[in-house]
Amino acid sequence: SVVELGKMIIQETGKSPFPSYTSYGCFCGGGERGPPLDATDRCCLAHSCCYDTLPDCSPKTDRYKYKRENGEIICENSTSCKKRICECDKAVAVCLRKNLNTYNKKYTYYPNFWCKGDIEKC
């Protein structure tokens, strides 16, 4: 769910998801128009694509359990849906951490109508 995703983002990046990622670029926090603006925005596109592979799941509301061992996120076995949601969320949190060096504050609260052009395919 968004609760676990938020915790993962804080743990991986040290940034609060709101406002750092909830309206960043063209893909973080929804919107999904135009090409990604940078590597951080591309992480959010990949996360959206991952969720698209889970049509029978409810990634924003299904709660799941995970733990951290030696700094790594470990998704705990529960239902197939919850495990797959957790893996999608883990991937985006790790991606955001790996791309902290290119995080650009000017893309926070980026107006969606500026996102033009073809959407990059998954």
UniProtKB/Swiss-Prot annotation:
Region (Important for membrane-damaging activities in eukaryotes and bacteria): 105-117
Record text on activity regulation: Suramin inhibits the myotoxic activity.
Tissue: Expressed by the venom gland.
Disulfide bond sites: C26-C115, C28-C44, C43-C95, C49-C122, C50-C88, C57-C81, C75-C86
Function, in words: Snake venom phospholipase A2 homolog that lacks enzymatic activity. Shows high myotoxin activities and displays edema-inducing activities.
UniProt family annotation: Belongs to the phospholipase A2 family. Group II subfamily. S49 sub-subfamily.
Name assigned to this protein: Basic phospholipase A2 homolog ecarpholin S
Organism field: Echis carinatus
